[in-house]
Design a protein with these regions (language model features):
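Adenine nucleotide-associated cytosolic modules
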Residues: 1-170
Length: 170
């Protein structure tokens, strides 16, 4: 246990409820580390299935997971890391009709998606509900990370009012 966290801090981590949206190259290690840290409740949302091409960059999945939903693969791996975690696997495409219900009641949302349409959808719902948002993006050897909606701070849309032009990354 990290000395600056202590028992009190670990209890707070165990009580935390986190949503991870996107279980690919970024979401895979995020989920692994949340589980290893002892986060008590993790909800993973992704509509996709594991493909052979995913395996080099999506470390949560293996060859036995090909053609399985990414969220089902993630649930199996998390239960091997920490059987006491409450893990909800949600295989669906998020849109305006379901995003709010999926994040309501959670302490933190981590956006591991790969497009600005999804990022704005997630951001807007988090801002509306006052839920902190950690945004991460990776592309090849480049990446970005940011924290939004924290203690009344700015949101993703405040920082990026419109999506970047096509071809710019991440």
């Amino acid at each position: 246990m990290l000395k600056d966290i202590g028992v009190k801090g670990q209890k707070r981590i165990k009580a935390a409820k986190v949503v991870v949206i996107g279980v690919g190259a970024l979401g895979s290690p995020v989920i692994q580390y949340l589980a290893a840290a002892g986060v008590g409740t993790i909800k993973a949302i992704d509509f996709d299935e594991v493909s052979l091409e995913n395996l080099q960059s999506q470390v949560l999945h293996g060859t036995r997971d090909v053609k399985r939903p990414k969220v089902a693969s993630a649930k199996d791996k998390v239960k091997n890391i920490n059987k006491n975690i409450v893990f909800e696997a949600v295989k669906e495409q998020l849109d305006a009709s379901n995003i709010e219900a999926e994040i309501e009641g959670y302490d933190l949302v981590i956006d591991c998606t790969d497009n600005y349409k999804a990022r704005y959808l997630i951001n807007d719902a988090c801002a509306l509900h006052g839920i902190p948002l950690v945004f991460g993006a990776i592309y090849q050897f480049e990446g970005q990370v940011g924290i939004f909606n924290l203690d009344g701070g700015p949101c993703l849309r405040c920082q990026y009012p419109s999506p970047p032009p096509a071809g710019l990354i991440p």
